[in-house]
Design a protein with these regions (language model features):
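Short inter-helical turns and helix N-cap capping residues of alpha-solenoid HEAT/ARM repeat scaffolds
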Residues: 42-43, 73-74, 104-105, 135-136, ...
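A generic tandem-repeat structural signature
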Residues: 75-154, 168-172
Length: 367
């Protein structure tokens, strides 16, 4: 696939006199060097980006970098590295996960238990069950969730119990695990939370059912898109994305006063195959809030519209690093011949994080 891509774009990239196989080799070597250099950066967020980009490459040659990053002093870098190994090598991910169940950071520890359950076969059940005795609620939830996925449904109650935990983060994490379990048995518990008094609980429950909503949920979703709370409105709009009958409800939200609600409505419509509201993506790339612009850039990676390449190039010219970072990852997600020359050009970008993500995605395209 990578060789075919180069054949298509070599003339455009200024390599007309070069053999395609040599071009592939040069781009790959340059990309690997960029990732290695980025991981040496003193700034933690750059190292974290390098680890995430290495995972996105899905390339075996970057396993040593990812293993090294699992021992980084920055928890986010360790987490991204572990998640990256999951994309590259099941055996390496399991080895790292077993070690990282003792990590100093609770979020990394619980992610390690979750990955142990997700990537392991029946042989990990005994290991995962041991974490049911952990003093950390997130560890116990990760273990219980993993066991439910392995068919031990009696542990579902251990994931449901934290929904009433006094610490909000524990409640939200429980909702997240229920969403990942995602079975028909779990959905009614999540739908029940649509009536919760706390907007945050409603928001997270809506996020958890995204892609799994049923027609029975539609009446309540129609109520929620009219709430004053913008976060609830935008999560409810996204939750409608797999219900084609919700199209008439979503179209008016494309004119909502909140940028994220508009974006969610346009994205939900796109996911259901509707061509309505496509102009919203370009509008929001000009929004005064960089958070909205970065979100708009990010979803273009999955949004198949005719003008996508032009819009991504627009986002890559943004003056905020978050927007440009989201845009380069979206270009990689888009993939194909159109992405290739854009990513090659970004190997010389002024921002190291942009160069790192371009490198990771190019390595993936060249596989």
């Amino acid at each position: 696939m990578g060789f075919l891509l180069v054949l298509l774009v070599v003339p455009e990239m200024g390599f007309a006199d070069s053999r395609p196989d040599m071009v592939v080799k040069k781009i790959r070597e340059t990309s690997l060097a960029i990732l290695q250099k980025a991981y040496q950066n003193e700034r933690a967020f750059v190292r974290a980006a390098a680890a995430r980009a290495a995972g996105e490459s899905q390339d075996l040659e970057l396993i040593p970098l990812l293993n090294k990053a699992t021992e980084d002093v920055y928890p986010t870098a360790r987490l991204f590295a572990l998640q990256g190994l999951q994309k590259v090598s099941r055996s390496d991910a399991l080895t790292a996960a077993r070690r990282m169940t003792d990590d100093t950071d609770i979020w990394v520890r619980s992610a390690a238990v979750e990955i142990l359950g997700d990537e392991g076969g029946p042989e990990v059940v005994v290991e995962v069950r041991a974490f049911l005795k952990s003093y950390d609620v997130p560890m116990r939830m990760a273990a219980s969730s993993g066991l439910v996925k392995h068919g031990e449904e009696k542990y579902l109650e251990d994931v449901l119990d934290p929904l009433t935990h006094p610490i909000p983060d524990r409640r939200y994490q429980a909702i997240g695990y229920l969403g990942k379990i995602g079975t028909q048995e779990v959905l009614p518990h999540l739908a029940k939370l649509f009536d919760h008094a706390e907007p945050e609980m409603v928001f997270y429950s809506l996020k958890a059912v995204e892609g799994k909503t049923t027609a029975e949920m539609l009446p309540k979703l129609r109520e929620l898109i009219k709430r004053d709370n913008a976060s609830v409105r935008y999560a409810a709009a996204l939750a409608m994305g797999n219900l084609r009958e919700a199209e008439p409800d979503l179209i008016p939200l494309c004119a909502d006063k909140d940028g994220m609600v508009k974006l969610s409505a346009a994205l939900a419509l796109n996911r259901m195959g509707s061509s309505s509201c496509q102009i919203v993506f370009e509008e929001l790339l000009k929004h005064p809030d960089f958070g909205v612009r970065s979100a708009a850039a990010r979803v273009l990676g999955e949004t198949k519209i005719d003008d996508r390449v032009r819009l991504l190039k627009m986002a890559l010219e943004d003056n905020h690093s978050r927007v440009r970072t989201a845009a380069v990852r979206a270009v990689g997600m888009m993939g194909g011949p159109e992405a290739f020359p854009i990513l090659v050009k970004l190997l010389e970008d002024s921002l190291e994080v942009v160069r790192a993500y371009a490198a990771g995605n190019l390595i993936h395209l060249l596989r």
